[in-house]
Amino acid sequence: MSEGEAQAPRGRGLPPDVLAEQVELWWSQQPRRSALCFAVAVGLVAGCGAGGVALLSSTSSRSGEWRLAVGTALCLLALLVLVKQLMSSAVQDMNCIRQPHHVALLRSGGGADALVVLLSGLVLLVTGLTLAGLAAAPAPARPLAAMLSVGITLAASGALLLLGLLLYQVAVSGHCPPARTAAPTTRSDRSGNGSVFSISGQLSAGQRHETTSSIASLI
């Protein structure tokens, strides 16, 4: 029973140190946030890519200028989000980053994802408002209905992205635990390990005493 009590604190004290040294596990922290940000990234790539291809494929002589510009911007935006996701996956697979703050920046749900969503929302909002403003100016050769509908759709999508990012940042800052709370735990674990070693030394001394007594009785 004493050996089990001596091994129990050691088993409880080792995992935090072991987990802290495993860089691969830093990428999988906070899986819910990672899954949410990955879903948003997939939605951005699919939505912007499909919208850009649709605008580029429907380009005609009457609406060639704005459809070509907006379609190209949407395709580039989808490519930017895709490159960020591929870069994070490549860095994680190569395991070339050893700093915790760098991992927290590049992993799914980190600061880089928030920056990409912010940039995407601003681009969509500005593009949508620009199209809506151009559609408000009457011109005989300009398809006002199509331009206005595309502008309103892009502006609404950008506003929703920015609002969702704001709510996400508020929720993350409200539920984020302080980073300095891990230091007392480490000290207590180390002190616990020290007591385990002293107890195990006493146990080994007691076992040697019992062994010596049994040999003397046999003689």
UniProtKB/Swiss-Prot annotation:
GO cellular component terms, semicolon-separated: membrane
Main location: membrane
Compartments it resides in: Membrane
Spans through the membrane: 36-56, 68-88, 114-134, 147-167
InterPro entries xrefs: TMEM125
Keywords, sorted A to Z: Membrane, Transmembrane, Transmembrane helix
Membrane topology qualifier: Multi-pass membrane protein
Entry superkingdom: Eukaryota
PANTHER family given in the database record: TRANSMEMBRANE PROTEIN 125 (PTHR31416:SF1)
Protein name in UniProt: Transmembrane protein 125
Encoding gene per record: TMEM125
